Amino acid sequence: DTCGSGYNVDQRRTNSGCKAGNGDRHFCGCDRTGVVECKGGKWTEVQDCGSSSCKGTSNGGATC
């Protein structure tokens, strides 16, 4: 569910599978600028950051 070694630990690829334990956490989507959350087993964008950047941590808590 990560985006590869070139990406930060706070990023997840939108629509990729996620672990159930991450369901209440928010990461930065690496396909586009937005916040993703685990919904229905996949990382789903819940907030579009638009022209703003997304900031996050390795254990979730991402915000625009």
Curated annotation (Swiss-Prot):
Keywords from the UniProt entry = Disulfide bond, Secreted
Q: Which cysteines are joined by disulfide bonds?
A: 3-30, 18-38, 28-54, 49-64
| Superkingdom of the organism of origin | Eukaryota
Q: Where in the cell is it found?
A: Secreted
Keyword Metal-binding in annotation: no
The protein's matches in InterPro entries, at most eight in alphabetical order, are given as: Bubble, Bubble_sf
Its GO CC terms are: extracellular region
Q: What does this protein do?
A: May act as a toxin. May recognize a molecule or part of a molecule with a negatively charged surface potential.
Q: What is this protein called?
A: Bubble protein
